[in-house]
Amino acid sequence: MGRRYFGTDGIRGKVGDAPITPDFVLRLGYAAGKVLASAPGRAASGARPTVLIGKDTRVSGYMLEAALEAGFSAAGVDVMLAGPMPTPGVAYLTRALRLSAGVVISASHNPYHDNGIKFFSADGNKLPDEIEAEIEAWLDKPLDCAASDGLGKARRLDDAAGRYIEFCKSTFPAAFDLRGMKLVVDCAHGAAYQVAPHVFHELGADVIPIGVAPNGFNINDGVGATAPDALMRAVRANHADLGIALDGDADRLLVVDHTGRLYNGDELLYVLVKDRIATNGQVEGAVGTLMTNFAVEVALKEAGVQFVRAAVGDRYVLEQLREHGWQLGAEGSGHILSLDRHSTGDGIVSALLVLAALKRSGKTLAQMLEGVTLFPQKLINVRMKPGADWKGSDAIRRAIDSAEQALSGSGRVLIRASGTEPVLRVMVEARQATDANRHAEAIADAVKQATA
């Protein structure tokens, strides 16, 4: 049976609408607490589980934090409160402090009126599907509050931000520093606002912070990785060397160079792979997604690096990295994984990896990406009748085959059905925009005629 509440990145929705309500989140805390308490070895040891709760800067975070805390306490689980903390910071602290689990209250790049809950295991990884299924099963059981002497306790984690700042700095090579560099750091009015500027400043950079005045309602609003225009303007206005854009929970990274040019996760993955090749001699493989630009795949293969596409979502990139035993993966949106540095995507750590690559090479981002020009993409969303059998259409198949034959080795076709509405997404990449447009429109026309 499929999961009812957990998606690819925890539980998420509009605050006040099910399931992001205080009563549900209290029960979620209780259910998660009971699963943790019954983990193998936990009951036998008699040790009380302890979880860490971090959050971003949404006004609803206070309400949901209190509800989670109450649920965990009712299940007999102790709670440590980190306050505003990037998602990767919660993952790191959970592992470093040897806690039972970590919980993040955040809806990442979404607007302030959304929020969500995601869990990390004791080793700093997102919970396996089977554990999330156990938690959902407990949600159907009565809430049986622990006796007074068995209730969980709650306390603030002293210097949570400072601990995470030191971890981030430790991932930057000791042989380098950032003295002489002017950086604009955009924290999206989100979870990294008390952390990211300090990391880069303490490593020697002249830091110009933006997006560091959260009021509970302005997270991701015209700032951050989902709205990089503000950063691009700030970099040019301040004559900065580089701009760093994080999202609301700081697990994404986009970078802007001194000219104001924006670099996405696909391009940054290529930069990091090239840096590893220069320092280690070779990189066996890297992981992208179905949406990774074809130019990056071509460039990596030309560099002798295997490339695998995962389903869209950093969870699936991580699965492929583990399956192949590789270290580097990314999504175009800015989720970058470097498993020799962290167990999850970390915008700050990823920025430090990019900065280290620039320091080692003595090149700019544009120079490191010389010869790699992203292919133009044409995306057309075609609305269909609900339940239309587009896969069984010979006309659609012929249109796809025709495009793939014409683009062989110089582009690709991706057809994806929306998971939430009767829409077929037709995406074509080609070296020339005219070719991408022509083939995408031909396929879209075939879809419209076959599914009308």
UniProtKB/Swiss-Prot annotation:
GO terms for cellular component: cytosol. PROSITE patterns: PGM_PMM. It catalyses: alpha-D-glucosamine 1-phosphate = D-glucosamine 6-phosphate. SUPFAM superfamilies: Phosphoglucomutase, C-terminal domain (SSF55957), Phosphoglucomutase, first 3 domains (SSF53738). The modification Phosphoserine is found at residue 108. The active site is at residue 108. Coiled coil: none annotated. Binds 1 Mg(2+) ion per subunit. Disulfide bonds: none annotated. Pfam families: PGM_PMM_I (PF02878), PGM_PMM_II (PF02879), PGM_PMM_III (PF02880), PGM_PMM_IV (PF00408). The keyword Metal-binding applies. Its EC number is 5.4.2.10. One of its GO terms (molecular function) is phosphomannomutase activity. Gene3D superfamilies: Alpha-D-Glucose-1,6-Bisphosphate, subunit A, domain 3 (3.40.120.10), Alpha-D-phosphohexomutase, C-terminal domain (3.30.310.50). Keywords: Isomerase, Magnesium, Metal-binding, Phosphoprotein. Its cofactor is Mg(2+). Catalyzes the conversion of glucosamine-6-phosphate to glucosamine-1-phosphate. HAMAP family: GlmM_B. This is Phosphoglucosamine mutase. It comes from Burkholderia pseudomallei (strain K96243). The gene is glmM.
